Amino acid sequence: IMYLIVGLGNPEEEYSKTRHNMGFNAINKIAEQYGIKVTKNKFQGLYESALIEDEKVILLKPQTYMNLSGNSVKEFVDFYKISKEEILVIYDDMDIEPGKIKIRKKGSAGGHNGMKSIVSMLGTEEFTRIRIGIGRPEHNGDDINYVIGSIPEEEIPKLEEGVEKAKEAVIEILKNGVDSAMNKLN
């Protein structure tokens, strides 16, 4: 069994500190804790394979634009013959407040372009996802600026908390399975 753990984000440097990059941040946190460098480049993604909690994993940050993330994920899934039960996708979600996460075994992509791309490329919604709350902008209709604009200093700790919880969720899933993670962390 090999797990594919995907964090979604935008590869360009200018987006590195934005709400839309929570998935990348979570992968970086996991990598940091286990001394893994996610720097190999293949299938339009930065990745590394490693052992985490005695499980074989690939940590992946697709380097396509967000709305093409599925292209990279699909190539990894096909090449490593990863079953949908072993796919985890981590991404930002405006319907969840900052500092909170939600773990689900399946479901629609919601309004998230990266997830839409993955669902469409894999042809299934049945894979685990960890959504990191980023909340909503005060003024409706400002969504784009909100997700890729810079984050006010005072909001960073809350968002970091969500990233930290997402990391814990991944570790819990690898150790004890998705149900256990859902019970403990949702």
Locate the predicted segments by residue.
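Short glycine/threonine-rich catalytic loop with a Thr-x-Gly-x-Asp
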Residues: 108
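Hydrophobic alpha-helical segments within soluble ligand-binding/sensing domains
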Residues: 111-114
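Nucleotide and nucleotide-moiety/phosphate-recognizing core
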Residues: 1-105, 116, 120-130, 137-142, ...
